[in-house]
Amino acid sequence: MTNFQDKPNIRIMFDSLAPTYDKINKILSLGLHLTWNHSFVSLLGRSDHLLDLCAGTGHVALSYIQKYPQASATLVDFSTKMLENVQECHPLAPFSYVISDVTSMPLPNDTFHLASMAYGLRNLSSPLEALKEVHRVLKPKGRLGILELTRPATYNPVHLLHKLYLNLVVPSVGRFYSGNSYAYSYLKESIRNLPCDTSLERVFHKSGLHIIRKRKLLFGTATIWILEK
């Protein structure tokens, strides 16, 4: 399996969302994504440098350097507008920027001890190829942390509430604040179409990355995996 689903031109979509992306996501998640980011950073552990993939507006990298002030980060994203947002809002942050798709990064082999990918896995058109590329740039025993929005299991008591939330709240709030209901309908569909854990973890294994830790957050509405090369 190399494609989770057919993707729209999400580069254009994310460029259009960049000015309001943080505000909308705070509202949509009731601020929980900030708590999840902190949990994610804690599980990533200490490193001098973080490779932040699908970096968006840089919240994970910012949380990381707040926890580890001596660290720096390389932010990779295919959305120019998202990375420009980080540069404008945080001009003094110890960041370098790479505008690139994760499937083909202009980075050398065996370079990074630690990489992160938050809320980006479900947007990859070729997840296996992207993870193989991450494997290429990680040093031996290097680690990749993945934080992703996921679906609670059908037997989970919050499954129905989560489904209603995705179907009704997410597109409505996105339309109200961004004027782009399609983008947040896409968010709903991207979560709904994300394969189950078993299928995802098979892709991880095929890429050469092996799970060393896994944590479910808020009844399975988000999941953290720590993978090792």
UniProtKB/Swiss-Prot annotation:
Any one GO BP annotation for this protein: methylation
Gene: menG
Protein name: Demethylmenaquinone methyltransferase
Pathway assignment: Quinol/quinone metabolism; menaquinone biosynthesis; menaquinol from 1,4-dihydroxy-2-naphthoate: step 2/2
Disulfide bonds: none
Catalytic reaction(s) noted: a 2-demethylmenaquinol + S-adenosyl-L-methionine = a menaquinol + S-adenosyl-L-homocysteine + H(+)
Residues given in the record as S-adenosyl-L-methionine binding sites: 57, 77, 101-102
Pfam families, alphabetized: Ubie_methyltran
Keyword annotations of the record: Menaquinone biosynthesis, Methyltransferase, S-adenosyl-L-methionine, Transferase
Gene Ontology molecular functions: demethylmenaquinone methyltransferase activity
UniProt family annotation: Belongs to the class I-like SAM-binding methyltransferase superfamily. MenG/UbiE family.
UniProt-listed Enzyme Commission number(s): 2.1.1.163
InterPro entries cross-referenced by the UniProt entry: SAM-dependent_MTases_sf (IPR029063), UbiE/COQ5_MeTrFase (IPR004033), UbiE/COQ5_MeTrFase_CS (IPR023576)
Species annotation: Chlamydia muridarum (strain MoPn / Nigg)
Function, as annotated: Methyltransferase required for the conversion of demethylmenaquinol (DMKH2) to menaquinol (MKH2).
